[in-house]
Amino acid sequence: MKRTTLLLLAVAALFCVSCNNRPKYSEELQQTAPALCKGAEKKLVCMDLDATLTQHKTPLSDSARQALDKLGERYALLMVGGGGAERIHKQMLDYPIDVLGNYGMEEARVVDGEWKIVRKEVCPVDTASVLAKCQALREKYGYTEYYGKSVEIHASGMLTFGLLGTEAPKEEKLAFDPDKAKRRAMYKEVCEDFSDYSVFIGGSTSFDMTPKQYNKYDAIMRFAEENGYSRDEIIFIGDDLDDGGNDSHVRLGGMDYIRVYDYRDFPKLVEPLLQ
């Protein structure tokens, strides 16, 4: 049997036996399993970090590390995150993996065993305009009380508009908007106010905003073109693929993907890729 056929059977078996407590996975099988088996054989596995490999901003677990080790024996691996490359590297406990940070504004590579940032792109920000727009949104939607600063303006030019502020307690952040309904209610208006940016519902309380040309799909494809991969040779693993999610451009761009509903399932979800 061809490897792609074996992969399809393995995916089907996995989804049947591992998802008694998470029935959404069996629904996703109809989309995911055929996607794994079309086109060229996979060579590059790209993945998100928060809510895919780890809980939001928590260290990489031993089980996730072991899964990455196994994947790395067969595929090239690429971490694609909304946060900065150094933050991602630290959260992964210095795991040796190539990283695209800030939706592609940063790139870090493992070169001769050493992890280092090889590219950083910076865009200017109209700070006064950003602060005014965020304040107007807070007043309209009732988020005028917050911890720390209203919006984080990164050195890269990326923005993080956290509804609870930049210094909210972790427990409060995790409990604030787990289904993203609060942020989805204002997402359209945030996009309209920040029309020069790509706007994503990121993290647990925030909107991530990048200069318009940056998103995960284009970041991956730039990396692929520079390193000799076709789109059909790539598979992406992420959790936030719905419209407005910070992985959504991957789905909209037509790249094959595996959706994660619970980061603790990551080791099982990648088993079919190891068949």
At which residue positions do the language-model features occur?
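Non-catalytic pre-domain segments flanking phosphatase-related domains
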Residues: T4-M47, S63-Q66, K70
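Mg2+-dependent phosphoryl-transfer enzymes with acidic/Ser/Thr/Gly-rich catalytic loops
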Residues: L36, A40, L60, K212, ...
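Asp-based phosphoryl-transfer active-site loop
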Residues: E41-T58, M79, I220, D247
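Hydrophobic "anchor" residues on beta-strands that sit immediately upstream
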Residues: L44-C46, D98, I235
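Active-site phosphate-binding/coordination module
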Residues: T58-G148
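Residues at the C-termini of beta-strands that transition into short coil/loop
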Residues: Y103, V111, G203, Y261-R264
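Conserved acidic, metal-coordinating active-site core of Asp-based
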Residues: E145-I235, D243-N246
